[in-house]
């Protein structure tokens, strides 16, 4: 059975290696084309016995397939900043901390990560000042050898003195000037200094493990307690896995039989959303879920209020009572109004919800459009109304989690939403998910539709290196991948040196990348066009993917107005955002008023614990018409109890700091942070995917990833459709009303000027000349990035057309006499 299960991976091992080697060569070529040796597309050995290609893979259909968008000058600067060395230590002679005096920091144009936030000391020894900001391993070894030599000399002197004392001799020519106690103390200090290597970070800062004084009890009980808790967690995890296997067997044996099993197979085999909808409706009829939709009564929403408001809004719209309708909408357009956006309403059927809810959503959308187009409401009032609608209703965001190469499943999620025109304007990504988010936010809709195809695998070449090469790098640097090489290969996804601000101006989508500072006590930053508008996107992608042991922390790079590339945030280094904020829901709410988060979660250590005891959106409980529990009440209760017990002990380990800070990181956050959103998508992960968790996909694999991602997104699209139906109408209203600011007529300007001068000097008979400039024009939507605490919609500012002037008539234009 195992042989059959993994057999489909074996034929692709050869082509994948060949593809990686060819891409490594063609990427450095001037043309950057990856298909020069394969004009017909496909792998070189993907041919049948007749010599024809098995699959017609054609990379030429992808826009910019022959471009790399690499700016070598930027990469050279990036590499130079990463390799910048410290001022060498002039003397390796060790000095105690009491002999160190504070020294003013060296004035530099910027602060690099190697001397960021680190105290500086001046070591005074023989009137020589030494910058002992960081002592390398070589210096420590030299000090250790120095003290060993001193100790050997002292021992020889002592033994020689004892021998001569017995012989009655006087004096000792080899007598040292240094006291015996000082030498022994220095040797002991040097030994401690050598062992302190393991308690230092990479930038030389010593980890203070006992900063708050844990006491001797902590050191005695820490490791035994951690051992017993770890064994208990291992036992609980084993029991949890057994419960999940029993629940899956229970559902497959008792529920999915006969016609139900056939309909379920058709549902899972749907390649398009239309096919999936038809299969879902057939399955609902078979399971008896269709009857639930007709009955408006349900305890998870206020069906009485919704029914009354639907009739009232329709009546006011048909009677053309715009003022009354706009007042009612102010109270109705809110997030999850009367429970109509509750996920439970969409978890009872495979497709659809209550008919009353669908009618309300349709009527509400028509009412919003009617208010926008009604001539009975002036433009100023419309602008205020839609500003309130936007704030009350909020915004939606797509959050793509990390997860190594599992993150390529996000491609299918984005494709499914894009095909139905439901892709949110705000997209965030972390680690591997940041790469997909960057691709979605730097390309237009039409470009994305051409890019999200199986041939996209030819452009993903991050893991091209052979085993001996990356093992040697890992042994030498502590990281499997090279930062500069990854920066070069990610430039295609970011269109070169594009910044967050430039991406927003090009597509109107807001890219967010979560990164964590290398300092464990500094706050996390969510990079976007507000917090870091001029930051290069490819540098944020590297920082967000810098998992310890995989990629070393890197600096964010900033583009100046002159086009120069310099370090961002004083040159401090950043690492994988999944370590602390995989899903930055709170930050998105702060910056963009996001209150509906659609999360695509592919982290394997989190996805294995996903379990919806009462069903989830588009996936109801498979028995008892959706009214029961998955696996029965006993199975669901046991699953929840074990999972809560595991979480409790993880919180205990974090609270009492039992887990060591390996590579200066609190690893309990990997399990204890928030990983879900308003709606959470869990793409299906196969056991064979773990073998390629740090590997590049090939076209057949990419085709499967796109299929699985779309299959996961299909059940959630109806919920997202109802949400975006209102949100997009409000967004269109905001864009339309902000461009309807009344343009001043010449008579208005004359009246204003007359009033101003009459109030300032009523008795003056002096006539003034005035030039009326051309009408001011607004910037196009999506180009302004101004923001304020009171408005998250970033209204475009007004500016004058080129050539307009406020010069008087005597200087340039004919006068207008008032």
Swiss-Prot record:
Main subcellular location: membrane
PNPLA domain location: 398-589
Broadest EC class assigned to this enzyme: hydrolase
Function: Probable lipid hydrolase.
EC nos: 3.1.1.-
Membrane protein topology class: Single-pass membrane protein
A GO BP entry: lipid catabolic process
UniProt source species: Yarrowia lipolytica (strain CLIB 122 / E 150)
TM helices/strands, residue ranges: 223-243
Region called Disordered, residue ranges: 1-50, 154-178, 781-805
GO molecular function: triacylglycerol lipase activity
GO cellular component annotations of the record: membrane
Active site: 431, 576
Protein name as annotated: Patatin-like phospholipase domain-containing protein YALI0D16379g
UniProt cross-references to PANTHER family, sorted A to Z: NEUROPATHY TARGET ESTERASE/SWISS CHEESE D.MELANOGASTER, TRIACYLGLYCEROL LIPASE PTL2
Family, per entry: Belongs to the PLPL family.
Compartmental location: Membrane
Protein's UniProt keywords contain Nucleotide-binding: no
UniProt feature, compositional bias: Basic and acidic residues: 164-178
Comp. bias (Polar residues): 22-38
């Amino acid at each position: 059975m195992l042989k059959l299960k993994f057999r489909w991976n074996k034929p692709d091992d050869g082509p994948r290696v060949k593809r990686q080697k060819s891409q490594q060569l063609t990427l450095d070529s001037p043309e950057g084309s990856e298909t020069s040796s394969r004009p017909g597309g496909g792998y070189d050995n993907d041919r049948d016995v007749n010599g024809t290609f098995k699959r017609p893979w054609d990379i030429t259909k992808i826009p910019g397939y022959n471009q790399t968008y690499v700016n070598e000058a930027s990469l050279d600067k990036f590499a130079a900043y990463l390799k910048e060395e410290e001022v060498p230590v002039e003397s390796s002679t060790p000095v105690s901390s009491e002999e160190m005096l504070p020294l003013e920091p060296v004035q530099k144009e910027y602060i690099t990560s190697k001397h960021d936030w680190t105290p500086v000391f001046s070591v005074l020894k023989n009137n020589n000042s030494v910058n002992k900001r960081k002592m390398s391993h070589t210096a420590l070894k030299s000090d250790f050898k120095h003290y060993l030599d001193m100790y050997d000399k002292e021992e020889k002197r002592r033994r020689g003195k004892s021998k001569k004392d017995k012989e009655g001799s006087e004096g000792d020519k080899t007598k040292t000037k240094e006291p015996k106690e000082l030498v022994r103390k220095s040797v002991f200090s040097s030994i401690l200094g050598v062992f302190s290597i393991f308690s230092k970070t990479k930038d030389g800062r010593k980890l203070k493990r006992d900063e708050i004084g844990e006491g001797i009890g902590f050191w005695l009980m820490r490791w035994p307690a951690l051992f017993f808790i770890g064994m208990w967690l291992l036992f609980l995890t084993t029991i949890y896995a057994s419960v999940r296997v029993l629940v899956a067997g229970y559902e497959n044996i008792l529920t999915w039989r006969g016609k139900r099993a056939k309909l379920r197979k058709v549902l899972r085999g749907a390649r398009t959303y239309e096919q999936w909808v038809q299969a879902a409706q057939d399955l609902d009829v078979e399971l008896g879920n269709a009857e639930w939709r007709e009955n408006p009564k349900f305890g998870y929403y206020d069906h009485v209020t919704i029914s009354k408001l639907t009739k009232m809004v329709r009546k006011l719209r048909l009677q053309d009572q715009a003022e009354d309708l706009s007042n009612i909408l102010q109270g109705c357009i809110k997030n999850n109004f009367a429970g109509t956006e509750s996920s439970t309403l969409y978890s009872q059927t495979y497709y659809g919800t209550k008919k009353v809810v669908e009618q309300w959503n349709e009527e509400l959308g028509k009412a919003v459009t009617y208010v926008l187009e009604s001539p009975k409401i002036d433009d100023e009032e419309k602008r205020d109304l839609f500003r309130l609608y936007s704030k009350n209703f909020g915004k939606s965001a797509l959050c793509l989690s990390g997860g190594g190469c599992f993150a390529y499943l996000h491609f299918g999620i984005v494709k499914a939403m894009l095909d139905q025109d439901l892709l949110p304007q705000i997209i965030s990504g972390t680690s591997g998910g940041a790469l997909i988010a960057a691709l979605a936010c730097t390309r237009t809709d039409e470009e994305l539709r051409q890019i999200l195809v199986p041939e996209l695998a030819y452009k993903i070449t991050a893991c091209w290196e052979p085993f001996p090469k990356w093992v040697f790098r890992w042994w030498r640097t502590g990281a499997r991948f090279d930062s500069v090489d990854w920066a070069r290969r990610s430039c295609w996804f970011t269109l070169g040196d594009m910044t967050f601000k430039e991406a927003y101006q090009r597509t109107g989508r807001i890219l967010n990348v979560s990164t964590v500072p290398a300092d464990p006590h500094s706050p996390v930053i969510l990079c976007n066009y507000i917090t870091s508008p001029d930051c290069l996107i490819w540098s944020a992608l590297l920082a967000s993917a810098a998992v310890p042991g995989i990629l070393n922390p890197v600096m964010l790079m900033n583009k100046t107005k002159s086009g120069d590339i310099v370090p961002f945030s004083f040159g401090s280094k950043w690492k994988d955002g999944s370590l602390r904020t995989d899903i930055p829901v709170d930050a998105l709410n702060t910056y963009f008023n996001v209150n509906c988060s659609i999360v695509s979660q592919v982290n394997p250590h989190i996805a294995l614990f996903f379990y919806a005891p009462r069903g989830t959106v588009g996936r109801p409980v498979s028995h008892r018409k959706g009214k029961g529990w998955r696996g029965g009440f006993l199975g669901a209760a046991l699953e929840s109890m074990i999972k809560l017990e595991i979480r409790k002990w993880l919180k205990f380990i974090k609270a009492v700091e039992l887990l060591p800070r390996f590579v200066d990181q609190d690893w309990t956050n990997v399990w204890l942070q928030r990983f879900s959103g308003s709606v959470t998508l869990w793409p299906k992960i196969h056991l064979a995917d773990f073998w390629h968790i740090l590997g590049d996909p090939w076209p057949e694999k990419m085709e499967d990833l796109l299929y699985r991602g779309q299959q996961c997104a299909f059940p959630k699209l109806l919920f997202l459709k109802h949400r975006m139906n209102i949100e997009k109408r409000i967004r269109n209203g905001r864009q339309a009303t902000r461009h309807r600011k009344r343009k001043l007529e010449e008579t208005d300007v004359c009246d204003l000027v007359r009033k101003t001068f009459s109030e300032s000097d009523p008795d003056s008979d002096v006539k003034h000349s005035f030039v009326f400039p051309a009408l001011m024009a607004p910037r196009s939507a999506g180009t302004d990035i101004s923001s304020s605490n009171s408005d998250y919609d970033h209204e475009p500012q007004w500016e004058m057309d080129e050539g307009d002037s406020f010069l008087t008539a005597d200087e340039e234009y004919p006068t207008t006499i008032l």
